[in-house]
Every structure is written in structure tokens, then in C-alpha cells.
Amino acid sequence: MATLLRPVLRRLCGLPGLQRPAAEMPLRARSDGAGPLYSHHLPTSPLQKGLLAAGSAAMALYNPYRHDMVAVLGETTGHRTLKVLRDQMRRDPEGAQILQERPRISTSTLDLGKLQSLPEGSLGREYLRFLDVNRVSPDTRAPTRFVDDEELAYVIQRYREVHDMLHTLLGMPTNILGEIVVKWFEAVQTGLPMCILGAFFGPIRLGAQSLQVLVSELIPWAVQNGRRAPCVLNLYYERRWEQSLRALREELGITAPPMHVQGLA
């Protein structure tokens, strides 16, 4: 096992430029047909992917905040599902435009001053508020490495970079309970194995009170909204900053959460 993974881990650990902003890492196919398919691509065999999936799943379950392990799990288990999501985007005018233009979300692409100047209640202002209140940054999303198709690599990168948008849309904080609720919504929306795994096994770390609230109120709400809303990857969020968050929720059929979960863990 160690022998099979050693070349991958060596390239993973020694990969230059891992701290570059997301906007500087375009996901575009090589024109010469040789070498990596996109920036940071690490080609792996099916067996190597299986070993990486098993190891990353164990680490992600042990520590849900190991976003690097969650990222590896998503890339090594979601190939078929990513094709379905890609096809959904291709069939939607807004989604097709996203696939064509490949927008990225990072501090180098966001005009934070403009977002701050937007009216209260707008998507852009509320997204910025979410980042500030929860002390998170869009620059923490790892670049895609193990998806052997450059367009599918962009799809999963886009999913990662709009994750905080989903927190904003659903009104969920970044504590454990909030993350699990978002994972249930994402599991229904995307069908990605890592989302399903996180949705089912994430609650293991919850206390009795939070678990009861999750099962009785928050999971049914997240599942219902996930089924009712159109594919959230088809939203060109960067062109909707000025739209009212309330209006966007109404457009998507997303209702208010049944309770405030900021103080729960």
C-alpha cells in the first residue's frame, strides 16, 4: 500500500505553489494532450484512488474539519456523480455559461469593497457578513488534484467555492450542527458520496440535545429544501450580488430554517 501511494504523496507534498490564490489557478485543458490535464492535477490509478478514498474517509470522519481530507474524498469517489452534475449545468443556460467562463471565488476575484457597499439584505452583503461573522475565507478551498477530467475538475472546484454561498442561503453557521445541515442539503442536491457520508456520519459527534433537534427538525427541513430547489451549481452568484437574499430564496424555494442554530453544537 505504501509503495502504491508513495509517488502520489511525494507529488502531493512537494507540489509547488499550493498557496496561490484560486483565481491564479484556471482549470483549463492542456492543448498538447500530454502531462497533467490542468494545474495541480495528479494522475492516479483506480487502486491508488481507492486507497486514497479509504484513508481520507477515515480521517474526515475522525475530524470533519480536515478540509484537505474531505477534498480528497470528494475527488476520489465522485466521478460518476460529477458527470451528472456537469450535464445538469450544460442543460441550463446559467450553468452552461459558468462552465464556459469558469469563474473562481477567492479574495483576489471578489471586490470586497463593492460587497460592503451593497444594500443590507442583498446576497453580496449577506455573504460578506457570513464570512466576517464566522471568520472564514474563500481562499481556504483546496485546488482539485485527483479528478482525471478537466471539466469535471472545475465542477467539483465550483462546488467547493460556492459552499459558503449555501451556508448563506440556508442561514447556517459553521459550527458542527450547521455544517451537518448543509451537508444534508448538499447530499440531496448533488448526490456526491462525500456529502452523503458526511450527512450520515457527521451526527456521531453531536450531543444528545443537538442530535434530537437535528433529526426531528433540521434534517427534514434540509431534505425538503434540497429536493425543492433547482441545482445550486447553476447559479452565477457573482452576477447576483445585488439581488435580495430573500428574493433569491423565494426563487429557489428555500424556506427559513425552523430554528436558530448558532448557539447549538
Curated annotation (Swiss-Prot):
Compartments, as annotated in UniProt: Mitochondrion inner membrane
Effect of G95D: In COQ10D7; uncertain significance; does not support cell growth in a yeast complementation assay suggesting loss of function
Cofactor(s) listed in the protein's UniProt record: Zn(2+)
Keyword Secreted: no
GO cellular component: extrinsic component of mitochondrial inner membrane; mitochondrial inner membrane; mitochondrion; protein-containing complex; ubiquinone biosynthesis complex
Bilayer topology annotation: Peripheral membrane protein
Residues carrying Phosphoserine: S108
Effect annotated for changing G178E: In SPAX10; uncertain significance
Binding-site residues for Zn(2+), renumbered to this chain: H163, D164, H167, E179
InterPro entries per record: Coq4, Coq4_euk
Expression sites by tissue: Expressed ubiquitously, but at high levels in liver, lung and pancreas.
Catalytic activity: 4-hydroxy-3-methoxy-5-(all-trans-decaprenyl)benzoate + H(+) = 2-methoxy-6-(all-trans-decaprenyl)phenol + CO2
EC number: 4.1.1.130
GO terms of biological process kind: ubiquinone biosynthetic process
Keywords: Disease variant, Lyase, Membrane, Mitochondrion, Mitochondrion inner membrane, Neurodegeneration, Phosphoprotein, Primary mitochondrial disease, Transit peptide, Ubiquinone biosynthesis
Effect of G124S: In COQ10D7 and SPAX10; likely pathogenic
Transit peptide (first-last residue): 1-30
Alphabetized GO MF terms: 4-hydroxy-3-methoxy-5-polyprenylbenzoate decarboxylase activity
Annotated PANTHER family: UBIQUINONE BIOSYNTHESIS PROTEIN (PTHR12922), UBIQUINONE BIOSYNTHESIS PROTEIN COQ4 HOMOLOG, MITOCHONDRIAL (PTHR12922:SF7)
Database matches in HAMAP family: Coq4
Protein function: Lyase that catalyzes the C1-decarboxylation of 4-hydroxy-3-methoxy-5-(all-trans-decaprenyl)benzoic acid into 2-methoxy-6-(all-trans-decaprenyl)phenol during ubiquinone biosynthesis.
Family, per entry: Belongs to the COQ4 family.
Assembly: Component of a multi-subunit COQ enzyme complex, composed of at least COQ3, COQ4, COQ5, COQ6, COQ7 and COQ9.
Disease: Coenzyme Q10 deficiency, primary, 7: An autosomal recessive disorder resulting from mitochondrial dysfunction and characterized by decreased levels of coenzyme Q10, and severe cardiac or neurologic symptoms soon after birth, usually resulting in death. Rarely, symptoms may have later onset.
Protein name according to UniProt: Ubiquinone biosynthesis protein COQ4 homolog, mitochondrial
Gene source species: Homo sapiens (Human)
Encoding gene, per UniProt annotation: COQ4
